[in-house]
Structure formats: C-alpha cells, structure tokens
Regions:
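Extended beta-strand/beta-hairpin segments
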Residues: 1-53, 60, 64-154
C-alpha cells in the first residue's frame, strides 16, 4: 500500500434530465440514473446501488488483506449486500446495510478463525467505517474439498 493520505477524484457529466456519466481518470465511463423507486429508468447504476457496491468491493479487498495476514486461505467469496432506505428524523437515508458474505474455504479450515477474518474485514473496511449507517454482517462459511495439484508440495 502507498503511504496515506490517498486522494480520489470522480467527475460527473449530465444534463437537466436523463442519465449521468461518471468518469474517473481513464476508467470506463459509468452510466448512472435514479432507481425506479425515484422514477428512474431502472437500467443503469443508481447512487444507491453504487454505495452498496462500494461496501462490497471494499469488504472483498479488505478481506483479502486480512486473510493473507491471518494466514487463512479461501477458495472464493460471494457477497449479497442489501440496503434499506427510509425516512429517519425527516431525512431520507440508508437505515441499514446488511452484508451477507459466503466464504468458500478448503475442507478442514478453522471456522472460528475464518469467521473472525470476515468480522475483522467488515470492521476494517474504509468505506463501511466512513458511513453513519449501521452495517450488519451475516456471514456463512462453506467448506469444499480442494483438489491437490500434481507436483504440489505441502
């Protein structure tokens, strides 16, 4: 990791109606629009979906680092993240975000350590830590037999 602080810049281009294009330094343009709940077309990324995707992405990348440092191997990760938008104290906001990771680990993995790695990743994720919204983790661990590669040394 490069030394802190890090700076990120995103640009938005839009007219008075329709889609908005989000640009960030040579990356593919991201087409955005309001979700159908706010009378949007429902065929583009919305700010609400982008926030949940940011929580998921940060969780994954933090998990990779935490698992590596903790020497906990995993085969794959699947995450479903949901958020509830509601009005609280006169402000429309995310009332809760629920992160449901399914961590696929090799058979025989210490489940307690694997759960600990998931919990630590959620707490250490900079996106989640930057939000005022409560984030609930509902983890699942699934063990699978992993074939040993020919010639691999244990």
């Amino acid at each position: 990791m490069r030394p802190l602080p890090h700076r990120y810049v995103v640009r938005l281009a839009a007219g008075p109606t329709g889609y908005a294009d989000v640009l960030a330094g040579g990356r593919p343009t991201l087409r955005t629009a309001p979700p159908v709940e706010y009378d949007g077309p429902g065929d583009a990324w919305s700010p609400e979906h982008l926030l949940l995707a940011a929580v998921q992405g940060c969780f994954l990348f933090t998990l990779r680092a935490v698992a590596r440092m903790s020497k906990v191997d995993f085969v794959s990760l699947e995450v479903e993240t949901g958020g509830t938008v509601d009005r609280q104290n006169g402000v429309t906001r995310f009332a809760e975000i629920v992160v449901r990771p399914t961590l696929i680990v090799p058979a025989g993995t210490d489940r307690t350590r694997a759960l600990g790695v998931l919990r630590k990743a959620e707490k250490a994720c900079l996106v989640s830590a930057s939000l005022a919204t409560p984030i609930r983790l509902e983890p699942e661990i699934v063990e699978v037999d992993v074939p040993v590669l020919a010639g691999a040394i244990g």
